[in-house]
Amino acid sequence: MLVRGATSGAGIALARLLKGKFPKVHLAGTSRNLAKEDQLKAIGFDQVILEKDGVLQTQEQFDKVLELVGPSAILDTFGRTAEGGIICSCALLGGQWTVSDFDPIEMLSRNLYLTTFASGNVSKHKFQALVDFVEQYHVDVRPEKVYRIDQIQEAHAYLGGSHSFGKVIVKNEDDL
Protein backbone atom coordinates (compact mmCIF):
# COMPACT_ATOMS: atom_id res chain seq x y z
CA MET A 1 0.00 0.00 0.00
CA LEU A 2 1.11 3.55 -0.75
CA VAL A 3 0.16 6.79 0.99
CA ARG A 4 0.82 9.92 -1.06
CA GLY A 5 1.17 12.76 1.42
CA ALA A 6 2.34 10.49 4.24
CA THR A 7 3.47 13.29 6.59
CA SER A 8 0.00 14.86 6.65
CA GLY A 9 -2.39 14.26 9.51
CA ALA A 10 -4.48 11.89 7.38
CA GLY A 11 -1.37 10.02 6.21
CA ILE A 12 -0.16 9.53 9.75
CA ALA A 13 -3.63 8.49 10.90
CA LEU A 14 -3.87 5.90 8.12
CA ALA A 15 -0.48 4.45 9.05
CA ARG A 16 -1.43 4.13 12.70
CA LEU A 17 -4.85 2.64 11.96
CA LEU A 18 -3.55 0.19 9.35
CA LYS A 19 -0.56 -0.98 11.36
CA GLY A 20 -2.74 -1.28 14.46
CA LYS A 21 -4.78 -4.05 12.87
CA PHE A 22 -2.43 -5.31 10.15
CA PRO A 23 1.13 -4.84 11.44
CA LYS A 24 2.69 -6.97 8.67
CA VAL A 25 1.22 -5.06 5.70
CA HIS A 26 3.97 -3.34 3.71
CA LEU A 27 3.26 0.39 3.87
CA ALA A 28 5.07 2.92 1.71
CA GLY A 29 4.66 6.66 2.08
CA THR A 30 5.70 9.68 0.09
CA SER A 31 7.26 12.90 1.24
CA ARG A 32 8.80 15.91 -0.45
CA ASN A 33 11.32 15.97 2.39
CA LEU A 34 13.36 12.83 3.10
CA ALA A 35 14.52 14.38 6.37
CA LYS A 36 11.18 13.06 7.73
CA GLU A 37 11.99 9.45 6.83
CA ASP A 38 12.89 8.42 10.41
CA GLN A 39 9.66 9.95 11.76
CA LEU A 40 7.60 8.11 9.15
CA LYS A 41 9.31 4.80 9.89
CA ALA A 42 8.80 5.33 13.63
CA ILE A 43 5.01 5.43 13.15
CA GLY A 44 4.86 2.36 10.92
CA PHE A 45 5.89 3.18 7.37
CA ASP A 46 8.20 0.52 5.97
CA GLN A 47 9.39 2.54 2.99
CA VAL A 48 9.61 6.27 2.21
CA ILE A 49 9.59 7.48 -1.39
CA LEU A 50 10.63 10.95 -2.47
CA GLU A 51 8.01 12.96 -4.31
CA LYS A 52 9.45 15.70 -6.50
CA ASP A 53 7.21 18.15 -8.37
CA GLY A 54 4.25 15.76 -8.15
CA VAL A 55 6.21 12.78 -9.49
CA LEU A 56 7.28 9.78 -7.42
CA GLN A 57 10.96 8.99 -7.67
CA THR A 58 10.30 5.29 -8.22
CA GLN A 59 8.83 3.03 -10.88
CA GLU A 60 7.38 0.68 -8.26
CA GLN A 61 3.65 -0.05 -8.50
CA PHE A 62 1.18 -0.52 -5.66
CA ASP A 63 -2.07 -2.45 -5.27
CA LYS A 64 -3.70 0.18 -3.09
CA VAL A 65 -3.06 3.93 -2.88
CA LEU A 66 -4.40 6.56 -0.50
CA GLU A 67 -4.07 9.72 -2.59
CA LEU A 68 -3.88 12.75 -0.29
CA VAL A 69 -2.01 15.11 -2.62
CA GLY A 70 -5.00 15.07 -4.96
CA PRO A 71 -5.50 16.21 -8.55
CA SER A 72 -2.03 17.71 -8.88
CA ALA A 73 -0.49 14.24 -8.47
CA ILE A 74 -3.24 11.79 -9.38
CA LEU A 75 -2.14 11.28 -12.98
CA ASP A 76 1.22 10.08 -11.67
CA THR A 77 -0.65 7.91 -9.16
CA PHE A 78 -2.52 6.17 -11.99
CA GLY A 79 0.85 5.16 -13.43
CA ARG A 80 2.08 3.90 -10.06
CA THR A 81 -0.97 1.71 -9.41
CA ALA A 82 -0.83 -1.96 -10.38
CA GLU A 83 -3.42 -3.46 -12.69
CA GLY A 84 -6.66 -3.97 -10.77
CA GLY A 85 -5.44 -1.63 -8.03
CA ILE A 86 -7.57 0.69 -5.93
CA ILE A 87 -6.97 4.42 -5.51
CA CYS A 88 -8.83 6.40 -2.86
CA SER A 89 -8.48 10.13 -3.52
CA CYS A 90 -9.64 12.04 -0.48
CA ALA A 91 -7.58 15.19 -0.01
CA LEU A 92 -6.27 18.20 -1.90
CA LEU A 93 -2.87 18.80 -0.32
CA GLY A 94 -1.40 19.72 -3.70
CA GLY A 95 -3.61 22.81 -3.89
CA GLN A 96 -5.31 21.78 -7.14
CA TRP A 97 -9.05 21.03 -7.06
CA THR A 98 -9.69 19.39 -10.43
CA VAL A 99 -7.96 17.29 -13.09
CA SER A 100 -7.91 18.92 -16.52
CA ASP A 101 -8.73 16.73 -19.52
CA PHE A 102 -9.50 13.69 -17.38
CA ASP A 103 -10.30 10.70 -19.60
CA PRO A 104 -11.39 7.88 -17.26
CA ILE A 105 -11.47 5.22 -19.99
CA GLU A 106 -7.88 5.90 -21.03
CA MET A 107 -6.43 6.78 -17.63
CA LEU A 108 -8.05 3.89 -15.76
CA SER A 109 -7.68 1.41 -18.64
CA ARG A 110 -5.64 -1.06 -16.59
CA ASN A 111 -8.80 -1.93 -14.64
CA LEU A 112 -8.03 0.58 -11.90
CA TYR A 113 -10.65 1.46 -9.32
CA LEU A 114 -10.98 5.10 -8.30
CA THR A 115 -12.93 5.92 -5.18
CA THR A 116 -13.11 8.76 -2.69
CA PHE A 117 -14.10 9.74 0.82
CA ALA A 118 -15.81 12.93 1.90
CA SER A 119 -15.83 14.04 5.53
CA GLY A 120 -19.53 14.91 5.20
CA ASN A 121 -20.24 11.18 4.90
CA VAL A 122 -19.90 10.54 8.63
CA SER A 123 -22.57 9.30 10.98
CA LYS A 124 -22.73 8.71 14.71
CA HIS A 125 -22.50 4.97 14.03
CA LYS A 126 -19.41 5.29 11.78
CA PHE A 127 -17.68 7.60 14.24
CA GLN A 128 -18.34 5.19 17.11
CA ALA A 129 -16.96 2.34 15.00
CA LEU A 130 -13.76 4.36 14.56
CA VAL A 131 -13.50 5.01 18.31
CA ASP A 132 -14.06 1.30 18.97
CA PHE A 133 -11.35 0.39 16.42
CA VAL A 134 -8.87 2.79 18.06
CA GLU A 135 -9.57 1.26 21.46
CA GLN A 136 -9.49 -2.36 20.25
CA TYR A 137 -6.18 -2.02 18.40
CA HIS A 138 -4.57 0.47 20.79
CA VAL A 139 -4.00 3.06 18.06
CA ASP A 140 -1.88 6.04 19.10
CA VAL A 141 -3.99 9.15 18.46
CA ARG A 142 -1.81 11.71 20.20
CA PRO A 143 -1.32 14.93 18.21
CA GLU A 144 2.15 16.15 17.29
CA LYS A 145 1.74 19.37 19.28
CA VAL A 146 -0.84 21.14 21.45
CA TYR A 147 -1.23 24.92 21.46
CA ARG A 148 -3.33 27.38 23.45
CA ILE A 149 -5.81 29.59 21.63
CA ASP A 150 -3.50 32.58 22.05
CA GLN A 151 -0.84 30.58 20.14
CA ILE A 152 -2.99 30.00 17.07
CA GLN A 153 -0.60 31.92 14.83
CA GLU A 154 2.28 29.72 15.95
CA ALA A 155 0.18 26.61 15.30
CA HIS A 156 -0.68 27.80 11.81
CA ALA A 157 2.95 28.67 11.08
CA TYR A 158 4.07 25.24 12.32
CA LEU A 159 1.59 23.41 10.09
CA GLY A 160 2.58 25.51 7.08
CA GLY A 161 6.30 25.00 7.64
CA SER A 162 8.56 22.29 6.32
CA HIS A 163 9.11 20.79 9.79
CA SER A 164 5.46 19.96 10.53
CA PHE A 165 4.43 16.35 10.98
CA GLY A 166 0.80 15.40 11.40
CA LYS A 167 -1.86 17.43 13.14
CA VAL A 168 -1.93 19.82 16.05
CA ILE A 169 -4.62 20.75 18.54
CA VAL A 170 -5.49 24.30 19.54
CA LYS A 171 -7.22 24.35 22.92
CA ASN A 172 -9.46 27.13 24.09
CA GLU A 173 -8.14 26.77 27.63
CA ASP A 174 -5.19 28.02 29.64
CA ASP A 175 -4.00 24.55 30.65
CA LEU A 176 -2.09 22.40 28.22
What are the residue ranges of the model-derived segments?
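Mid-domain Rossmann-like dinucleotide-binding core that forms the NAD(H)/NADP(H) cofactor-binding site
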Residues: 1-52
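N-terminal Rossmann-like NAD(P) cofactor-binding module of classical short-chain dehydrogenase/reductase
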Residues: 2, 65-66, 88
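Short beta->alpha linker loops
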Residues: 7, 31-35, 51-54, 68-69, ...
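Short, well-ordered alpha-helical microsegments
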Residues: 11, 37, 73-75, 153
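Terminal peptide-recognition signature
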Residues: 18, 40, 65, 77, ...
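Glycine-rich phosphate-binding loop and adjacent beta-alpha segment
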Residues: 22, 40, 72-136, 172-176
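A short acidic, Gly/Pro-enriched loop at the edge of an enzyme's catalytic core
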Residues: 57-65
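C-terminal hydrophobic helical "lid"/dimerization subdomain
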Residues: 122-176
